Amino acid sequence: MSQLSKVEDEILSQVKRFLKHINSNLPEGMELEFEGFYRRGFFVTKKRYALIEDDTIVAKGLELVRRDWAPIAKKTQRKVLMAILRDGSPEKAREIIREVVGRIRRGDVELDDLVIHTQITRDLSEYKQIGPHVIAAKRSLEKGRRVERGSIVRYIIVKGRGPISQRAFPVEDAEGMGYDPDYYIENQVMAAVSRIMSSLGYSTEDMNSLSSGERQSSLDAFF
């Protein structure tokens, strides 16, 4: 048995003794439960965190567990967290972001990785704030597709001028239109990883250079 395994066994043994002591003093019907043992954790805020157990990320409140983010953002965030929590390497996390940003700028991303899923929670006429999903839903209606309360709208943000919401098109109609790389870099990928990286010491300038593809100094010494 490795030294690390011995330490883990000792910690788990202490946890069990602690639970037994606490539960013996709790009122009937109440019980403190053990949920899991995690070697590393990363807390963005109290209710937004990621933990790792073996090679599995357990997350709460982060983009990778939310449906209304493009897969490219969720996948990148998951890879970044694995680099930090499993490998202990901010440098690797940085290179992951740089590689994804480069692929987006080159147009080397599958359409499915750009699709945003958002649920329609009310009648379209009841929306006061007309977000991208509402515009995409209305365009689907114009094409004769059924859209109602509870429907999931799948859309892409395409290139062009004007507000982002006006450039939201149903995925069925977006083929060949060309996605907006700046939107997917700034509003999806960087939005999903910037708070994580800034918690490791990356500045706004560092993040700007990442999103533009510039080189920057290593933070491997952090770990």
UniProtKB/Swiss-Prot annotation:
Domain of life: Archaea
Keyword match Transferase: yes
Temperature dependence: Optimum temperature for DNA polymerase is 60 degrees Celsius, functional between 60 and 80 degrees Celsius. Exonuclease activity is higher at 70 than 50 degrees Celsius.
Entry keyword set: DNA replication, DNA-binding, DNA-directed DNA polymerase, Exonuclease, Hydrolase, Nuclease, Nucleotidyltransferase, Transferase
Signal peptide (residue range): none
Chain coiled-coil ranges: none
GO biological process: DNA-templated DNA replication
Uppermost EC category: transferase
SUPFAM superfamilies named in the record: DNA/RNA polymerases (SSF56672)
Glycoprotein in keyword set: no
Record's catalysed reaction(s): DNA(n) + a 2'-deoxyribonucleoside 5'-triphosphate = DNA(n+1) + diphosphate
GO molecular function, one term: DNA binding
Pfam families listed in its UniProt record: DNA_pol_B
InterPro entries (alphabetical): DNA-dir_DNA_pol_B_multi_dom, DNA/RNA_pol_sf, DNA_pol_B_thumb, DNA_pol_palm_dom_sf, DNA_pol_type-B
Functional description taken from the UniProt entry: In addition to polymerase activity, this DNA polymerase exhibits 3'-5' exonuclease activity.
Oligomer status and interactors: Formed of a complex between PolB1 and PolB2; the exonuclease activity is associated with subunit 1. Probably binds replication protein A (RPA).
Extra information: In some Methanobacteriaceae the PolB protein is split over 2 genes.
Protein name listed in UniProt: DNA polymerase PolB subunit 2
Organism: Methanothermobacter thermautotrophicus (strain ATCC 29096 / DSM 1053 / JCM 10044 / NBRC 100330 / Delta H)
Name of the gene encoding the protein in the UniProt record: polB2
